[in-house]
Amino acid sequence: METEAFPPFFPLMNLRRIPYYARVVVCGHLCNGLWRSRLERRRIRGRAIRKAADAYLRPYGAAAAAVPEDAPDRSGSRRVFSLWLQGEAQAPPLVKACLASMRRNAGAEVVVLDERSLADWVDLPEGILRKWKEGRMKPAHFADICRLELLYRHGGVWMDGTDYLDTPLPAWLWEADFFVYLGGDRLRGAYSGIQNCFIRAAKGSYLLKVWREAVLAYWEKEDSAVDYFVHQMLFGAAVAANPRAAALYAEMPALVQDPTHVLWYEWADKPYDEARLHAICAPALFQKTDYKTDAARSPRPGTFADILLAPYR
């Protein structure tokens, strides 16, 4: 997934962001020599974005510095939440396949919400709803807020509609107060810090609480995302500003997201084999997919993509 390093005409859009974009342009592009390999240039660009974002987001992280801590409540939180704003019936075949895999394999109640049913589960701040309805907030960033609110109110596991689940969620996950995969090296993960398409949080999780505080502080003041991965980077800002959150984060299992991107990004166009499917999925809790890829839109016959999508086309 490509990042939005800087939107067009950015100085005219938000004057406070000029230092952020200037640093990204100078350090991530102008001083990023073409003699370097593509991978190295990408890493340098990612580091520049991360440093610029850390400075820009620091005030929002500070909003979470003194959040009071409550005892986590793990009772009644064996529930998986997902969201497809247009409604599951309108979802692409790959999303339908992923949601079906959750219901088949999660070993927990699966709740799939849409824009209409969302209000039955959470009360979103009026300012957030207004920005969403006025088109100032992209669907992805609105969904970022929704997942935190759902887990904050109810506890459970959040899974994106493009997460494929091959085996039941393990006991250790349900026993954890909080878990996310770390960014790793795939898909700009190194500068996003964490993955946010799969989140476990018990009701009352302190890490989720400080993350939510930073996110709400950001969107109360901002009208757009400074970067596509602003949600993940706000987690980093909140943890950096809160010693208790930093201590809890250090205790979390340090698993990188790389093994969650194997099935779709390496095998979608290859001949299907059931034993191979289970072997690919085994090293990770789930597999991230992408309904916008050619493999999802026009799968070649007999491939992993074709077999997984066949019942839903």
Where are these regions (language model features)?
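Glycosyltransferase-associated regions of secretory-pathway enzymes
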Residues: 1-143, 161-313
